[in-house]
């Protein structure tokens, strides 16, 4: 699953991304978590699944220090979008893509919920939110009021999990997948290896259903 490593220079900043191309007219932009990068199981297999279904993939390689999350959510969103927007624009400007979708984990759900879901040009894009940061009101409200199709996955042992919120989100167009006994990394229990592998397999299976339906 080797892609082309590319970079964009903006002022004195370099923003790197990897573009994995299979000659498709659809693309999935992926946004990693703070410590959960594209080599980790969920991203690895989600990337493989996209390529299997003839969807090109873009991994955006941002990194932020721990102090960013101490700032107001509007600031966090702007900092992230300042890195993400130029790459989305660069990838889409060729006109090769008719369809786009967005997949983020944890930190990577911030740009999806607080920006991309609200943009008219992406109103038909599927949104995939893995362990979203639902304790932030802006993220929860945005997902609740969005009309997007897609998928939301969260473990019921995740510190971001709230049963009342999930019940409300059931009214959205997103398919909701709750992983029993799973934490923020979607690990099941403390060291339950087989159950954790099964949980990831189930998430990828559900993602396949979402990706396949037009």
Model features per residue range: what roles?
Residues 146-147, 152-154, 158:
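Short beta-strand/loop motif that positions the catalytic acidic residue
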Residues 122-134:
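A conserved short beta-strand
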Residues 102-113:
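Gly/Ala-rich beta-loop-alpha elbow adjacent to hydrolase catalytic centers
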Residues 6-97:
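Serine-hydrolase catalytic machinery in alpha/beta-hydrolase-like enzymes
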Residues 135, 156-161, 184-185:
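Acidic catalytic loop of the alpha/beta-hydrolase fold
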Residues 162-174:
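Conserved loop-alpha-helix segment in the C-terminal half of the alpha/beta-hydrolase fold
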Residues 39, 158-165:
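Conserved alpha/beta-hydrolase "acid-adjacent" motif
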Residues 182-198:
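Catalytic histidine-centered segment of alpha/beta-hydrolase-like enzymes
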């Amino acid at each position: 699953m080797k892609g082309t490593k590319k970079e964009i220079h903006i002022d004195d900043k370099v923003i790197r991304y990897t573009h994995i191309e299979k000659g498709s007219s659809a693309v999935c932009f992926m946004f990693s978590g703070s410590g959960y990068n594209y080599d980790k199981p969920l991203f690895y297999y989600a990337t493989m699944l996209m390529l299997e279904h003839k969807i090109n993939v873009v991994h955006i390689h941002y990194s932020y220090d721990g102090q960013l999350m101490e700032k107001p959510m509007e600031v966090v969103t702007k900092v992230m979008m300042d890195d993400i927007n130029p790459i989305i624009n660069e990838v889409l400007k060729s006109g090769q893509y008719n369809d786009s979708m967005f997949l983020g984990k944890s930190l990577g759900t911030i740009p999806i919920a607080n920006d991309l879901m609200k943009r008219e040009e992406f109103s038909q894009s599927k949104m995939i939110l893995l362990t979203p940061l639902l304790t932030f009101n802006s993220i929860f409200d945005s997902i609740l009021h969005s009309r997007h199709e897609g998928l939301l996955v969260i473990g019921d042992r995740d510190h971001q999990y709230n049963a009342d919120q999930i019940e409300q989100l059931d009214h959205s167009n997103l398919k909701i997948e709750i992983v029993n006994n799973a934490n923020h990394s979607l690990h099941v229990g403390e060291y339950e290896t087989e159950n954790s592998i099964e949980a990831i397999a189930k998430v990828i299976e559900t993602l396949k259903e979402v990706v396949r339906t037009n």
